């Protein structure tokens, strides 16, 4: 288990403030957030690569807060691979054993062969990094990070430098690595689709603070904070305080709520949904994969996502009267912490 308690870091004007984080042994957690949120700083603090002002970092009941990086049994892999250009693939991988006092133990040769097979890199062991594709370099970087069976594998945006096709392949391999080796993994990304696919749990970070954390399926279906909802593309976020609306939405007190655009229904005829409104069509935007349609009534504007075929079927035009709405199960209750 990884336990980060009351972590405080100051790097120039940037701060990590009283950060709390728990990761179960063998868990795949994704640290998700926008650029400059502090994701990589947290990883490097766990790895011992940045100084901390205060706080405690425990791994498997061992206090590693003040240990040197080489004594933590933690590996970190970056998006730019960091392979040594003068070493071939097998030497780059074995370099991961440099701090092991028993690095000549036969168990590590067995470990090496298992990783080569798992990552499908047996045919490139003699090549130099300059002769490898981005995907091959990332596989080698992962093998180097995993050799020696670290307690924790830290991944800093491992997919961001890859083209889309290779990215999908490496995603599958990361999932396979975790399922096969049961290594505790913390991965940093700004891509919530990546996070949703790979993570068992997600911690969302912004401006050096954990905004929200929990099981990935729960957070992506119904985020609990305004920041998380906005970050994941939920455009319909409203403050409800009018007594009539509070009663209509079944809310006990003034609250923020969110509705995913894809959960809003539009029709030229009355529709059977829990919350039904009449209004007019506002702006219409073609986003290639879907059409974003604004539905406006006297109280607020809603964004709805429609497939192109359904949009064409409805023959919607700006200013056209429509019925729109959504179901109670799709109403997301949010707290303001941004």
Give the role of each language-model region:
Residues 12, 247-338:
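Non-catalytic connector elements of ABC transporters
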Residues 4-7, 14-24, 55:
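Conserved beta-strand
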Residues 55-63:
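Conserved ABC transporter NBD signature motif
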Residues 73-75, 88-224:
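ABC ATPase nucleotide-binding domains
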Residues 32-34:
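The feature captures the beta-strand-to-loop junction immediately N-terminal to the Walker
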Residues 53-56, 207:
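Conserved coupling/switch loops of ABC nucleotide-binding domains, chiefly the family-specific signature
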Residues 47:
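Helix-to-loop junction immediately C-terminal to a conserved catalytic motif
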Residues 40-43, 140:
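ABC ATPase nucleotide-binding domain helices that frame the ATP-binding cleft
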């Amino acid at each position: 288990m990884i336990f980060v308690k009351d972590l405080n870091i100051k790097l120039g004007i940037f701060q990590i403030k009283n950060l709390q984080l728990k990761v179960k042994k063998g868990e795949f957690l994704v640290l998700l957030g926008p650029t400059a949120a502090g994701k990589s700083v947290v990883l490097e603090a766990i790895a011992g690569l940045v100084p901390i002002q205060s706080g405690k970092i425990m791994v498997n009941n061992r206090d590693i807060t003040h240990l040197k990086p080489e004594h933590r049994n933690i590996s970190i892999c970056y998006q730019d691979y960091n392979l040594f250009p003068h070493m071939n693939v097998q030497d780059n991988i074995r370099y991961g054993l440099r701090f092991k006092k028993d690095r000549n133990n036969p168990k590590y040769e067995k470990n090496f062969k298992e990783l080569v097979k798992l990552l499908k890199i047996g045919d490139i062991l003699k090549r130099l990094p300059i002769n490898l594709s981005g995907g091959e370099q990332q596989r080698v970087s992962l093998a180097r990070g995993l050799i020696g069976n670290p307690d924790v594998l830290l991944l800093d945006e491992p997919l961001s430098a890859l083209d889309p096709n290779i990215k999908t392949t490496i995603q599958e391999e990361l999932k396979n690595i975790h399922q096969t080796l049961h290594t505790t993994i913390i991965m940093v990304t700004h891509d919530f689709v990546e996070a949703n696919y790979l993570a068992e749990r997600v911690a969302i970070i912004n401006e050096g603070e954990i905004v929200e954390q929990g099981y990935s399926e729960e957070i992506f279906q119904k985020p609990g904070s305004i920041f998380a909802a906005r970050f994941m593309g939920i455009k319909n976020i409203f403050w409800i305080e009018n007594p009539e609306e509070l009663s209509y939405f079944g809310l006990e007190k003034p609250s923020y709520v969110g509705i995913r655009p894809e959960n809003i229904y539009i029709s030229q005829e009355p529709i059977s949904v829990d919350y039904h409104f009449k209004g007019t069509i506002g702006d219409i935007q073609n986003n290639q994969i879907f059409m974003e349609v604004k539905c406006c009534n006297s109280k607020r504007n809603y964004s709805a996502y429609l497939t192109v075929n359904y949009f064409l079927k409805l023959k919607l035009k700006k200013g056209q009267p429509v019925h729109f709405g959504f179901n109670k199960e799709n109403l997301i209750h949010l707290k303001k912490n941004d």
